[in-house]
Design a protein with these regions (language model features):
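Short, charged/polar connector segments at secondary-structure boundaries
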Residues: 1-111
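Amphipathic alpha-helical extensions and coiled-coil-like segments
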Residues: 2-7, 15, 25, 41, ...
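Short hinge/gating elements
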Residues: 46-54, 122-127, 254-265
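Short, contiguous strand/loop micro-motifs
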Residues: 51-52, 81-82, 128, 139, ...
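Short, Lys/Arg-enriched anionic-surface-contact patches
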Residues: 75, 123-137
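Short, ordered loop/turn segments at secondary-structure junctions
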Residues: 111-114, 160
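Switch/connector loops and helix/strand junctions flanking conserved nucleotide-binding motifs
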Residues: 116-119
Length: 268
């Protein structure tokens, strides 16, 4: 631990150890259920500044609004003080659902958290929440990297992913805004996005248009991207031709054939 004035600031190793744990957010929220919650006017709570551009689909907001009207709040929101207002840390869907439902005051636990810890909480939440959007994880990882110098390996350890997966997730941020919007709204999956980031320029525009018009699956989108990269015709509803080179050897006695594939992907 290190001291900054009178405030104790967790070290990087302590933060990583804490937020790399499974279900750290679920445990945290369970602890907050027993803590005294404070009713805060909804009008005084602002969305988290880090992921405010990630739009929650209207149907999801409406579903949460209906649930809150029927059952009320089970878990309080987690917020932090920002001057005379409050900034949301966790509970975005409940927050926007409550606003749509017209709920005027919300139970909140006010947490004293610096920006780095807030981002780590958001990353752990997207990691543990299967319904979270991959673009949200990309935005959080990018900010941890640019603001606090987190390496891709550290982000991979925190996210329980491989370094190459983190690289692919971060590449999504380079996609044009209309594509990122479709990812946010759930119209395109991470698999679709991964196929699209391998393209640029006119090829990217072409692939995006075809994927939307023909409602291609992830596998079909990958075949389309492969065809565009290699300037080959895209054959819908067909398996890609696997290419291989080198020796094709056989043994009369063992009745075997040896194929040398061009890549691990072709072999699989």
């Amino acid at each position: 631990m290190k001291r900054e004035g009178k405030k104790v600031v967790p070290s990087l190793s302590n933060l990583i150890e804490k937020f790399s744990q499974e279900d750290v957010i679920a445990v945290m929220e369970k602890e907050y259920q027993a803590a005294p919650a404070r009713l805060i006017p909804t009008s005084l709570i602002d969305d988290t500044s880090f992921i405010k551009d990630i739009v929650i689909p209207k149907d999801v907001v409406s579903s949460f609004a209906a649930g809150l009207k029927e059952k009320g709040f089970y878990n309080p929101l987690i917020v932090r003080s920002k001057g005379d207002r409050f900034e949301l840390i966790l509970g975005r869907k409940r927050f926007f659902g409550a606003k749509k439902a017209g709920i005027l005051s919300l139970p909140c636990v006010v947490r004293d958290a610096e920006d780095e810890e807030v981002l780590l909480m958001l990353l752990a939440d997207t990691r543990d929440n299967r319904s979270a959007n991959v673009l949200e994880m990309a935005v959080v990882c990018k900010q941890l990297s640019s603001l606090f110098g987190y390496t891709q390996q550290t982000l991979a350890d925190l996210s329980h992913l491989s370094r190459s997966q983190i690289t692919n997730i971060l590449r999504i941020l380079s996609l044009p805004d209309p594509i990122k919007k479709d990812i946010t709204l759930g119209k395109l999956s991470y698999g679709h996005a991964r196929a699209l980031v391998s393209l640029d320029g006119e090829k990217l525009e072409t692939a995006y248009k075809i994927i939307n018009e023909k409602k291609l699956s992830v596998r079909e989108s990958e075949r389309l991207a492969h065809a565009l990269i290699n300037n080959e015709p895209y054959l819908e509803n067909s398996e890609p031709i696997i290419s291989f080179s080198g020796l094709i050897s056989s043994s009369e006695r063992e009745k075997s054939i040896t194929l040398n594939f061009n890549s691990k992907e072709d072999k699989e």
